[in-house]
Amino acid sequence: MIHNSKHDFIKYLPHTIAKGLVPYGIYNFLKKGRTSSYTNLLNSYHKSQKIPFSPGYQEAKLEFIQSTISSKELFSCFVHQILLPEGFGAFFDERVVEYPWIFANLNYNQNSKLLDVGPALNYKFCLDRLLSSNPNQEITMLSLTPDARCFYHNKVSYVLGDVRSLPFINNYFEQITCISTIEHVGMNNQRYGSTVEHNLEDYIVALLEMKRVLKNSGALLITVPFGTYEDFGWFQQFDETMVNRIVEAFVPTEHSITYYKYTDKGWNLCSSDLCSSIRYNTHRSNDPFFYTSNPVCAGAVACIKLIK
């Protein structure tokens, strides 16, 4: 089918972007202008044959995430937990499924309080989406060290602290998000400006602290790298036993676990048993064909929703 108008062209771009058929920069360029340096980074990434972590990779990944959550068709796949189109998120790391899953599971009620532990949502496009849906929402970002990105003018609060000892009263937040963070708790966090530890059970301490500050009927959304258990010193890859421990320790009134796996056809839904033997990829390559079958980082993720 041929769409003659610019409106139709933009409307159908997100789907083709997700399948890797259109450069990611085009979609947002048509929506609004980009700086020349930003565009140059995107062009550099695509000229590199989409090699992960090459110049422009981060920018291209964020563009991809934005186009996914802006696409009614693609976003509905996360809302309704249905299969993604073949090729979705190829050559990108697990963030391309974690962010849409988080946004699909947030409650956009008025006057709610949201705590982001990490904080992975500290991007303008994330905050714009949260505040456009709920302008009265109170958003608090928790991190170990200061983040260069600061949106205090959008009424976003920033708190420095350890998730194992949160500086908040009991039953305060309606929602808490924790995107690929809990696996770092109690580990070597020197790269994040913190200390060297090796306390493998402290993710449970963090979990119970988040439960403490969460209101009754509130939701805790957690994502972790998933597969066979691995200890890399600065983080752990969770296996099924550890995921089950999270649920058992939290004692939720309701819970759900969604798994996504990376294959030569990109990211898609998967059952836990088909992810259980996956290893985390720590290798880097300048050969784009390496990433057709090998994940960029995590080969699978567990997305856990816990209702207090």
Which functions belong to the PLM regions below?
Residues 1-83, 275-283, 297-303:
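Membrane-proximal basic amphipathic "stem/tether" segments
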Residues 25, 35, 158, 244-248, ...:
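A C-terminal cap/extension of S-adenosyl-L-methionine-dependent methyltransferases
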Residues 93-112, 123-129:
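Conserved alpha-helix/loop element of class I SAM-dependent methyltransferases that forms part
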Residues 113-165:
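Class I SAM-dependent methyltransferase SAM/SAH-binding core
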Residues 164-177:
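A short acidic, Gly/Pro-enriched loop at the edge of an enzyme's catalytic core
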Residues 174-200:
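A short SAM/SAH-binding and catalytic strip from SAM-dependent methyltransferases
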Residues 194-219:
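A short glycine-rich, Lys/Arg-flanked "PGG" loop and its adjoining helix->strand segment in the class I
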Residues 219-246:
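Conserved class I S-adenosyl-L-methionine
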